[in-house]
Amino acid sequence: MGLIAFILDGICKHCSTQSTWVLVGIGLLSILAVSVIINVLQQLLFKNPHEPPVVFHWFPFIGSTISYGIDPYKFFFDCRAKYGDIFTFILLGKKTTVYLGTKGNDFILNGKLRDVCAEEVYSPLTTPVFGRHVVYDCPNAKLMEQKKFVKYGLTSDALRSYVPLITDEVESFVKNSPAFQGHKGVFDVCKTIAEITIYTASRSLQGKEVRSKFDSTFAELYHNLDMGFAPINFMLPWAPLPHNRKRDAAQRKLTETYMEIIKARRQAGSKKDSEDMVWNLMSCVYKNGTPVPDEEIAHMMIALLMAGQHSSSSTASWIVLRLATRPDIMEELYQEQIRVLGSDLPPLTYDNLQKLDLHAKVIKETLRLHAPIHSIIRAVKNPMAVDGTSYVIPTSHNVLSSPGVTARSEEHFPNPLEWNPHRWDENIAASAEDDEKVDYGYGLVSKGTNSPYLPFGAGRHRCIGEQFAYLQLGTITAVLVRLFRFRNLPGVDGIPDTDYSSLFSKPLGRSFVEFEKRESATKA
């Protein structure tokens, strides 16, 4: 006791000579050190054999957030090598159990509604952007009805009508954009493709009134609303930050604008003159007999605009960047159009797009390596036993599926990190479709349980815009191939890294590519 008293007396005398700020700093460092020690001891001494292994980490709350956020795929593969397909890591204080491989995809993406919940995870982030009472801000049964409305609105007639509209938008953009005025030049890929995809989507899906506004008011509103997906909003979506105030103002203004469009159409007698989604939703009725309210139509249109734009813009940018590294593939695409469609290159149609096999493979291969969403997370609502193991995932965890891991795995795709559209010439990989289909309330869809290739997800939350995405990407790619040759800048090798900081992954930073107009484009 005398020794302890002597030590404490010495500490007190030393502290009495220090400033308050120094003492506060020492106190905080001491608390941090103690918390780190306790955290490490808990991991080493109190392992639960009935739960997946926890990825070792030094700091509580932070856990593995930083290493995961920098490069999720590297993190997943490193952890898989050490812990196997099932492991848990700390993501911003939340225990998140990852289950990789096709079994993991099935376990999570096809999890029963009573066991897993997407709304609890994504609603805080998406509701301020999309608006109330749609997508994740409503009961799952209502969401399934909303997905059915949108899916059934993408009829074959609608899709056929979109091809000439998308073609015209791309050609008009190239003709009028300052970036493409010369025979040769350099352009900012992500910026340019983002404009092309937003114009093509708004012209086709959104309607002519929305498209006309993108040359003025909508562009700024879209940008402000897009800031709602900023990384900090994963934690603080309701914080009174400047970008969130702009987000909220943009959401209100966009909602008002869509409702004005709907009101004007109703006052004009609701005479349908196009195949856009607004007309489709205006005629939809919920199962309880309630017509879809105009505000909900507006919010669904915003959700379509935001979610679809991110995924299409990112994928189309990667296609251009990949083609710039492989001019030989781009020339193959051009020759395919001449061979299949004719040397006069007739206007693109829905039917002749289906004949462009290599074009489809370029899109498929790009989605394999660059799926816009790398992680799909669900909250656990009931304890979930993992077949073949002793693990039971408790309700205090989230679960995470990463279909991109199987798409990058050697066991399914030889030389998985090589971008090679011709790998799809042979049936070396399982089809994206699955024999077993299920109706979650919006029509039969493949469960996708056995496929290593799921760029559009699987289960009840599978993307309903898959057909439109392939159509939009296919048309944009085909038009660009007709007009240009792309190549990397001198001294540039390969493609840029990936930015994983937002909900949707995309090329990191600004990426520039050389273009050269084809003779046919110059004459036109």
Curated annotation (Swiss-Prot):
GO terms classed as biological process: ergosterol biosynthetic process; methylation
Pathway named in the protein's UniProt entry: Steroid metabolism; ergosterol biosynthesis
Catalytic activity: a 14alpha-methyl steroid + 3 reduced [NADPH--hemoprotein reductase] + 3 O2 = a Delta(14) steroid + formate + 3 oxidized [NADPH--hemoprotein reductase] + 4 H2O + 4 H(+); a 14alpha-methyl steroid + reduced [NADPH--hemoprotein reductase] + O2 = a 14alpha-hydroxymethyl steroid + oxidized [NADPH--hemoprotein reductase] + H2O + H(+); a 14alpha-hydroxymethyl steroid + reduced [NADPH--hemoprotein reductase] + O2 = a 14alpha-formyl steroid + oxidized [NADPH--hemoprotein reductase] + 2 H2O + H(+); a 14alpha-formyl steroid + reduced [NADPH--hemoprotein reductase] + O2 = a Delta(14) steroid + formate + oxidized [NADPH--hemoprotein reductase] + H2O + 2 H(+)
Activity regulation text: The activity is completely inhibited by miconazole and reduced by voriconazole (6% substrate conversion), posaconazole (10%), itraconazole (16%), (R)-N-(1-(2,4-dichlorophenyl)-2-(1H-imidazol-1-yl)ethyl)-4-(5-phenyl-1,3,4-oxadiazol-2-yl)benzamide (VNI) (20%), and (R)-N-(1-(3,4'-difluorobiphenyl-4-yl)-2-(1H-imidazol-1-yl)ethyl)-4-(5-phenyl-1,3,4-oxadiazol-2-yl)benzamide (VFV) (31%). The weakest inhibitory effect is observed with fluconazole. Activity is also inhibited by ketoconazole, as well as by the azole-based drug candidates VT-1161 and VT-1598.
Alphabetic keyword roster: Endoplasmic reticulum, Heme, Iron, Lipid biosynthesis, Lipid metabolism, Membrane, Metal-binding, Methyltransferase, Monooxygenase, Oxidoreductase, Steroid biosynthesis, Steroid metabolism, Sterol biosynthesis, Sterol metabolism, Transferase, Transmembrane, Transmembrane helix
Disruption phenotype: Leads to the accumulation of erburicol.
Induction line: Over-expressed in azole-resistant clinical isolates.
Pfam families: p450
Superkingdom: Eukaryota
Subcellular location per the Swiss-Prot or TrEMBL entry: Endoplasmic reticulum membrane
Cofactor(s) essential for the protein: heme
Binding-site positions, heme: C463
Broad class of the protein's primary localization: endoplasmic reticulum
GO MF assignments: heme binding; iron ion binding; methyltransferase activity; oxidoreductase activity; sterol 14-demethylase activity
Matching SUPFAM superfamilies: Cytochrome P450
Known EC number: 1.14.14.154
InterPro entries in alphabetical order: CYP450_sterol_14alpha_dmase, Cyt_P450, Cyt_P450_CS, Cyt_P450_E_grp-IV, Cyt_P450_sf
Coiled coil: none
Record field: transmembrane: 21-41
Cellular component, GO annotation: endoplasmic reticulum membrane
Note: In Aspergillus, the biosynthesis pathway of the sterol precursors leading to the prevalent sterol ergosterol differs from yeast. The ring system of lanosterol in S.cerevisiae is firstly demethylised in three enzymatic steps leading to the intermediate zymosterol and secondly a methyl group is added to zymosterol by the sterol 24-C-methyltransferase to form fecosterol. In Aspergillus, lanosterol is firstly transmethylated by the sterol 24-C-methyltransferase leading to the intermediate eburicol and secondly demethylated in three steps to form fecosterol.
Protein task: Sterol 14alpha-demethylase, encoded by cyp51A and cyp51B, that plays a critical role in the third module of ergosterol biosynthesis pathway, being ergosterol the major sterol component in fungal membranes that participates in a variety of functions. The third module or late pathway involves the ergosterol synthesis itself through consecutive reactions that mainly occur in the endoplasmic reticulum (ER) membrane. In filamentous fungi, during the initial step of this module, lanosterol (lanosta-8,24-dien-3beta-ol) can be metabolized to eburicol.
UniProt family annotation: Belongs to the cytochrome P450 family.
Protein name, entry field: Sterol 14-alpha demethylase cyp51B
Organism: Aspergillus fumigatus (strain ATCC MYA-4609 / CBS 101355 / FGSC A1100 / Af293)
